Structures are given as structure tokens and as C-alpha cells.
Amino acid sequence: MSKRLAIVVVLVTLFLGTKPQSAWCQGYGTDTQNVMTPAAGGMAGVSVARPQDVPSAIFGNPATLAQFNGTQFTLGGGWVEGYPTVKNDGSANTTDNTPFSVTSRSEGFVVPAMGVTQDLRSLGLNGTLGLGLSGTSGLGAEYRGRVPESNILNNTSGEYMVLGMNVGAGFQLTDKFSVGAALTLGTAFEQLGLVGPAVSSAMVNDYGLRGNFGLNYDLNEANTVGAYYQTRMDFAFPDAVRIGSDYHDVRISQPETVGLGYANRSFMNGDLLLAADVYYKMWESAPLWEDIFVNQWAFAVGSQLTRGKMKYRLGYSYNTNPINHNVGNSLDGFPYAQANVQLFQAASTAVINQHRLTAGIGRQGFLIPNLDLDLYAGGLFNASDMFGTHTEASVAIYYVGMGLTWRYGDCCRSPQ
């Protein structure tokens, strides 16, 4: 049995250690929003009121950390792929009008989801501490050498990724009411493939901080509501673009986000969990994204059925399209022709998918009594959109993932 466990640990470690490659975002806008954590991944990311895995509590509503007893450690992650296709009638070319259709060659990448929670009740504190590491944002595409040479996409290769480390705590103030707070230290890597007149200089990185504040309340034994607020996470990438012979910084911020959630456990003797989340993302006040996105609503529903040691999960989400169809002629203050801004939207930031379907399965007592295994898969239905009158983009996104969770002390099962 110990050999089998060692093999599983090695495989997961190798999986998470794979070098990430540029791909496409799978959450809302450029944010992942818990859609690729071990249990919530099978429930369309639903986790605001009653999360079913450790990373979802750490990177979601920090007040829900108080629901986790004992010591729990999750090692997990997922693989996501999306290949945007851009079509243009040739008007974006500088010397000819040859129409083109090109699909990004960027490969998929790994999104880690790891976390540990430690119950503080043995110290006389009625709460739980959490620490985690996860991919929180990302997108990218690559078209070099595949479109007419007179088109700026012929030199375009873009990538943007944010890896976040979270530390937070949730405390039970009464039997029904809990509060929590978390701090995210994010490190971001940016090379968005901007071409003329502000040309991307190279891959650069920066760090940023984000605060997260949450509340959770049990209406009764079967119904729970939760809410949280995330501050903006600001990055300033040094010398990221070149205009002539001068280099300039580029500002990019992940938006303020408000999340609301509801969970019900009154059906099938408490074995059926039904939950729903609502998010509002404020792209219009986030540098760079404010030039190409509009504020966005997202709605997600998820279910989990427990049968003995098995858990079966389903989820669906819908979000409004964040694409701004009335863009101007600048990006983060740098001058760009409106047609080039629209081409940038289509080629590098076409987060246009609105419908998501997910499924997952969990096994308690996998290999050993205190180890749980969770698997999930999901996809965003193929979507297309027009960017101005000359450019169209389409993309479908798929992802799979898993997680192993070790539980010790006063926690024989994940919270439901």
C-alpha cells in the first residue's frame, strides 16, 4: 500500500512540475476564480458559501476557512487547452488585402492548486489558518509566421500569467457567523505581443498584493450564505514596451471582485449539496483591461451527491461577455489605431466564452483512510464574436484536473 501511495505522490508531483506553456484563460475574463480546484472544478467553481476543497476556501471566501477542522493538505492541479482562431478580411494588412484565418499554436499549461489548513482551536482560537499556491490568472496566444507578412499578427506572440500565494484565516465569531481575511502575493509574467507603435520588449515580471475579506452565515442547519470582496491586484511591468528608442512601463491590474454564495444541504438526508455563486468583476477600473473589457457578471450552480465514500459532482456557469465593442484608440495610454486595438482583442484577449459545463468525482479513503482523491473535467462551449467590422475570433476551452487531500485530526471527511 505504501508503494502505491508513493507512486501516486510522484506522479502528481511530476504533473505539477511540468513547465507551463502559454494557452488561454478558462475562468471569467483573465481570472480563474476557483474553476480548477480539485472539488470545485467539478462544480463550475462554486465555493463561496461551502467550499468542498482546501484551495477553494483559501483562494475564495476566507471566512469559510473556519469550516475546516484538524489539519488538511491538498496537492492538486489541472491542464487547460484553448486554441483561438482569428479571421480578418485583409483590411488589417498594410500592403495588401489578402484575407486570412489563423489558429494559435500555443500549447496547454498546468494550473496548480495547492493548500494547507490548520485548525487553531487547540490554541484557544476558534478558527483556521490557511496557506496556498495557485494559478490565479492567465492567457496567451502565438501566430508568428502564419499570416500575411504585412499584418502585425505575423510577429505576435503573447503571454500573461499570474501565480498567487495566499495566506488567510477564518474565525467563528458565533455558532452561525464567521469572518475571514486573506492576503495574496502575486507574481506575474507579461509579454502581450504588442506590435507598433508600442512594441513589446521582452517577457518581464512584477509582483502585486491583493486583499480578500469575507463573511459566512448559517441561516439554519441546512442553509448557508457567504460573501467576499477582493481588492484590485496591481502590476507595473518595467520597460515592457518600446516606442522608438525609449522604453516604458505597462500597467495591468486584476479587477476588484465581489462574490456572493448560497448552499443548501436539506435534501437526501444531507447527502445532496446544492450551491450557487454570483460574481461581479470590475474590469472598467483595472488598468489595461479597462481599455478592452467591460464589467462582468458571472453565475454558477453546482451539486455534489455523496454515496458512501463516493462523491459525484456537476456544475454549470454562465457569464456575460466582457468584451468592449466600443474601444478607443489606446492601450494603457499608448496610442493605437482602433482597428489594431480590435485585432489585439481578437487575437490575444478574446475571453468570449459564456457557457461552462463541468463534472467531477471524489473518493474518500483512497489507498489509505485519511487520503481523498478528486478528479474533474470541464469545458467552455465554442463561441465567436466580431471585433469591429473586419475581424472575428472563435475559441473553445477544455480542462481536466485532480487533487489528493490528506486529512488529520478532527476531520474524517471534507466539509458538506
Identify the residue ranges that each predicted region occupies.
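N-terminal secretory signal peptides that target proteins for export/translocation
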Residues: 1-3
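Sec-dependent N-terminal signal peptides
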Residues: 5-14
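C-terminal segment of classical bacterial N-terminal signal peptides
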Residues: 14-23
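N-terminal, post-signal peptide beta-strand-biased segments of exported outer-membrane/organellar beta-barrel
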Residues: 22-129, 133, 340, 347-352
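Outer membrane beta-barrel transmembrane domains
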Residues: 29, 96, 205, 209-416
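Short, solvent-exposed beta-strand-terminating loops
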Residues: 75-88, 188, 234, 321-327
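Solvent-exposed, glycine/polar-rich loop segments of beta-barrel outer-membrane systems
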Residues: 90-100, 149-152, 194-202, 239-249, ...
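Transmembrane beta-barrel wall of Gram-negative outer-membrane proteins
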Residues: 101-230
